[in-house]
Amino acid sequence: MILVFDVGNTNIVLGVYEQKDLIYHWRISTDKSRTVDEYAVIIKNLFDLNGLDMSRIKAVVMSSVVPPVMPTLESLARKYFDVEPLVIGPGVKTGMPIVYDNPREVGADRIVNAVAAYHKYGGPLVIVDFGTATTFCAISKRGEYLGGAIAPGVGISTEALFQRASKLPRIEIVKPKSIIAKNTVAGMQSGIYYGYTGQVDRIVTLMKQELGRDTRVIATGGLAELIQEDSQEIETVDPFLTLEGLLLIYERNSNQQP
């Protein structure tokens, strides 16, 4: 079995693969202050709750946009799984050319998503990832990573309204009953929901003009399904795209089966 880590600014998503099947997945908070042992306790509890034996893990793969937490997680793999983790970054074989001014600037999560999406759907395509930031990645018909756009995430924008406007409350991010709201909470929900849906569609429309009409649009991340409800551009929501990309990259760097 193989254990994969998608380390984001807010959450770490973990997945366990047996062969090519994702048999378990979990989401825990990203905490730079946690020790190796504290992360190990959390993961062991998750394994125990699902009847999994940690000794069956034969490989660990990680992608991260949070460099400070990586020494801890890499030590976790060595100490508790007795393996050297494969960390996505320069020197790791992805099979995807990166056509970018400085390829090292591209977040590991964006490359992992691109690898998985091109493998599953072909190109050209646009990948929208709803995380702490909302990212838009363009992939050519030949499977080249072309670049994209980065916008503040839905959660960041919502929190900014609460923090910077003294009379505005924290809100749940949901689809409002009507775009014309009758109270403050509904008004904020309307602005956030339809504002982000419009933002996504506009950016994707412009990308498709450059990539071509046959461009497919794939979304992933926490709010992908919600935004897809009113999006005119998102075709498919693929919630485990990043985890699948981690498995693919592992396979391209190893002859062993997970």
Swiss-Prot record:
Its EC number is 2.7.1.33. One of its GO terms (cellular component) is cytoplasm. Keywords: ATP-binding, Coenzyme A biosynthesis, Cytoplasm, Kinase, Metal-binding, Nucleotide-binding, Potassium, Transferase. Pfam families: Pan_kinase. Its cofactor is NH4(+); K(+). The active site is at D109. InterPro entries: ATPase_NBD, Type_III_PanK. One of its GO terms (molecular function) is ATP binding. It is found in: Cytoplasm. Pathway: Cofactor biosynthesis; coenzyme A biosynthesis; CoA from (R)-pantothenate: step 1/5. A monovalent cation. Ammonium or potassium. It catalyses: (R)-pantothenate + ATP = (R)-4'-phosphopantothenate + ADP + H(+). Substrate binds at Y100, G107, A108, D109, R110, T184. ATP binds at D6, V7, G8, N9, T10, N11, I12, V13, T132. K(+) binds at D129. It comes from the Bacteria. The keyword Lipoprotein does not apply. It is an enzyme of class 2 (transferase). Its main location: cytoplasm. Homodimer. Belongs to the type III pantothenate kinase family. Catalyzes the phosphorylation of pantothenate (Pan), the first step in CoA biosynthesis. This is Type III pantothenate kinase. It comes from Desulfitobacterium hafniense (strain Y51). The gene is coaX.
